[in-house]
Amino acid sequence: MKKLLIVIGLLFIVVWGYAQKPNYERMANTVMDKVVVESKFTTKKGLKWTYDLGVPLEGVFEVWRTTANETYFSFVKKWMDKYIDKEGNILNYSAEEYNIDHVKNGKVLLALFKATNDKRYLNACHRLFAQMQSHPRTNEGGFWHKKIYPNQMWLDGLYMAQPFLSEYADLMQKPELYDDIVNQFVWMEKNAKDAKTGLLYHGWDESRKERWSNSKTGLSPHFWGRGMGWFVFALVDVLDYFPSSHPGHNKIVAILQRTIKAVAKYQDPKTGVWYDVVDLADREGNYLEASASSMFTYAMAKGVRQGFLDKKYLKSIKKAHAGLVNEFVEEVSPTHINLNKVVAVSGLGGTKNYRDGSFEYYMSEPVVANDPKGVGPFMLADIEFERLKNQSAMSKSTHVILDNNSNTESKDSKKLLDNFQERISSARVSANAY
């Protein structure tokens, strides 16, 4: 009987291991079943146009590109089609709000246009671009975070708009946009960077009128993890479509290098991940946070893979990826996982329950499982880690041997990626014909 139980146990382990999908795919399944559901995006006015939708959908779209499983593509398209009508109008979107968060979903729309050549998605992107053409700015030219937050630049805002604008400029052949894209990062770093740590403060108020802002510097009090995460996320994604021949390209790379150097110093040596308030690991109440840790892992892995960051970070990346799994991932089944310890939201100011940017404020926000702002970056970080690992293996040997948990790119997936690149080329032609 004892031997039989041992055999059954071993068979269970083998079957579980054989059936288990890569973590990015298991996370995508959780997103489709539990995260991106209508009940979470429906308000009294109907479906809400929010970056909380675009962040996980971008992750699911990349899972489609990696696996060639049409289920993931269909899910992304189905959700965007709830918002985009036949003319490319966006449901419950108001450009006049001048909310930079609302531009983020344009990345998903651009991806769908390239995949389908359906001009509805491109027309919707034109509307988002039009918002940014008249979006309020600081005196030197930085985009306000929102009209209701005048004179303020937040780290979050760089992620919400600049990757979209970079890809839009590439698609629509608008090289005149690149200088402005570079300057947004230059100004953010100049105004928000701490000389001692190299980290960037969450927000900067040019007017110095906000209660959270320092009367001399205009800066918020702390280095928020996900804010820093949004910033490095934006840097590596902007570079996807930013021409290397442009003089601003090296400026973006240099900002990425400086910022990652600073972030790497605060990686928790025990777990490999990062704290919610990055530099205060020993402060009572501070906690290891999943979304920021996923974003840092993603930016480091992608930066090294694309040659923008030194390979000296490989050890940190490996430790960070292991930390994501060990510290935050909860096993559900061979096809699903949960992502724990994601801060639901953190901001600055406002009219109700004013957010003063204090340490106590950041610690007061709820920490949840499977928040959209965590699961999206986690999928992308997991994919980037596998791509980097495969690239490293290829550079060492023409005969690639990966461990059982690695995703080896299938012929179907390779064909899909090649076809997608062809679609991008044809999309440029189509885009400029509309």
Which role does the model predict for each range below?
Residues 30, 34, 59-62, 82, ...:
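Alpha-helical scaffold segments in carbohydrate-active enzymes
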Residues 58-61, 99-112, 143-157, 198-223, ...:
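Carbohydrate-binding/catalytic loop surfaces
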Residues 121-160:
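Asp-box/WD-like beta-propeller blade repeats and closely related beta-sheet repeat scaffolds
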Residues 178-239:
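Loop-centered beta-sheet repeat module
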Residues 232-281, 285:
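Oxyanion-binding "anion nests"
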